[in-house]
């Protein structure tokens, strides 16, 4: 047992980068208030905190559940076209997401399996959204790279 624990600790050190923290958010919420608080504001605040400590925070967000709607640029050609509250806020959401992707290097990974299930075409997504075969694979991959898991749900 001690050998297994020692091996796991050594593997953790292999993935750890000096001064770099890593987090993967498991984003499933469709609640706009929660999304804005935890993703749009929360990630910026967390990045600023670690920058103030002269440390880097790498962030990945795995998108599935009810969260697809926040990452679609063409709502008129999506299952969310009748969500008037979302349509009204979509421009602000897109600008803030683009800032997170571009200026803060946040990686957004969307579940392809759920996209197919919800009839969401890749061409309707923002260009900074990457596709992962499914949410579980995206989460496993990031956790295998040393990312800490945090869920964001309703």
Give the predicted meaning of each segment.
Residues 4-13:
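Sec-dependent N-terminal signal peptides
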